[in-house]
């Protein structure tokens, strides 16, 4: 049975057999005896890490060790309110800080400055905080995520792709009353040039135009 350690864009932690591209943590939030969660977070530093680092192997949910969480991709981690780790992802973390400065009007921002901002932007009353869209969802930078009803959507090239633990798929219906899932400060960093790593399925979903042309070609043949 899979452990409850996979994070959704809304920040919930679920159990699923699907694997993700990134790991990360929110401190120690598990009981090592039962390998079950005891809380949703232990500190304000919510990190996104690489799954492999210098050949080190970790026992998942071990004693006296941070709780390993997993994400479909970096866009999912950002939507939940995590940021790149400075230990295992230093180059990415530095690029993110530079984009944060450019997008949010700060100068030489540090992790200790970012963490309390993200904590306010990702939570409201202990639950995931949703924000009004700063622009039409089609105009959001690649990697931003929105929520509409029960579905989470990744925005790529002005298109909305439905998130699932297995990957992304084309949205089949119109998106109505969408709210911003990704913390606004992170969206501004995206707008300033940071490019989050996306799951391969985000790039493999054909556009409606391409799909339509393919259908026409099949009928004509």
What are these language model-derived features?
Residues 1-221:
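Mature, structured domains enriched in cysteine- and short glycine motifs
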């Amino acid at each position: 049975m899979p452990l409850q350690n996979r994070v959704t864009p809304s920040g919930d932690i679920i159990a699923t057999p699907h694997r993700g591209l990134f790991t990360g943590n929110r401190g120690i939030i598990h009981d090592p005896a039962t390998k079950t969660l005891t809380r949703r977070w232990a500190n304000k530093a919510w990190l996104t890490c690489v799954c492999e680092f210098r050949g080190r192997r970790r026992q998942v949910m071990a004693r006296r060790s941070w709780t390993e969480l997993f994400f479909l991709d970096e866009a999912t981690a950002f939507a939940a309110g995590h940021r790149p780790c400075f230990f295992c992802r230093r180059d990415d973390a530095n690029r993110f800080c530079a984009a944060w400065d450019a997008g949010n009007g700060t100068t030489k921002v540090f992790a200790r400055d970012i963490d309390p901002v993200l904590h306010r932007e990702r939570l409201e009353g202990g639950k995931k905080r949703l924000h009004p869209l700063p622009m039409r969802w089609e105009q959001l930078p690649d990697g931003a995520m929105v929520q509409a009803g029960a579905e989470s959507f990744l925005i790529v090239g002005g298109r909305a792709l439905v998130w699932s633990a297995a990957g992304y798929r084309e949205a089949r219906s119109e998106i109505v009353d969408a709210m911003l899932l990704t913390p606004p400060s992170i969206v501004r960093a995206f707008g300033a040039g940071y490019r989050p790593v996306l799951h391969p399925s985000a790039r493999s979903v054909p556009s409606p135009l391409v799909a339509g042309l393919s259908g026409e070609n099949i009928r004509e043949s």
